[in-house]
């Protein structure tokens, strides 16, 4: 809750979206169908923060923020703070010449720093764009397969122990952390500049697996969900 509130107060759109997604998956994994009201409340909070918290609305829609309402939001253009322009330039220079293999590890970031040697945009602000431009379709597809595998792996293990309260909570937390991390990677450089955020889901996954071992060995008392 405090993380979500801090994201709103600081007008961090990526943080708001990641919090909503992560908490929603946590509730759904932990409470199953009973989590639907909580998820709906989170969605309502997201919509409310976008339309009724002025700093968030200004950052989301830029100069047109005053004219954007719920009824005409479909026609509004979301402000990307220069990201869209930068991504197009990177894709044209580093991806389009060789879509299969990309420009090579470090190629896109190195090129961006070279053309902005006097300051300006020096971060790609998207791990997904960076992977696609530097590793091409092959590298991106391999990572997407890894991301999907990790999510389904944790979900499958969580479902197997769905009657255990502690394991279900840990599994839901791990799923939410992975989903939030992969979401943030779309709009920021999590892997290269916020490595703590990237490592956290894997730490939770390790704790989750170790807790399963301890539970099966009888070192933790199994608390059954009624």
Go through the PLM ranges and name each one:
Residues 53-78:
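Aromatic-rich transmembrane-lumenal/periplasmic boundary elements in polytopic membrane proteins
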Residues 1-56:
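Hydrophobic alpha-helical segments of polytopic membrane proteins
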Residues 174-226:
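Transmembrane alpha-helices of multi-pass inner-membrane enzymes
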Residues 24-33, 53, 151-159, 207-215:
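Structural signal for the C-terminal ends of transmembrane alpha-helices
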Residues 14-26, 143, 196-205:
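Hydrophobic core segments of transmembrane alpha-helices in multi-pass, intramembrane catalytic enzymes
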Residues 73-92, 96-135, 158-159:
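Long extracytoplasmic/lumenal interhelical loops at the membrane interface
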Residues 5-12, 132-135, 186-187:
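Transmembrane helix irregularities
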Residues 24, 36, 137-182:
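Hydrophobic transmembrane alpha-helices and their immediate junctions
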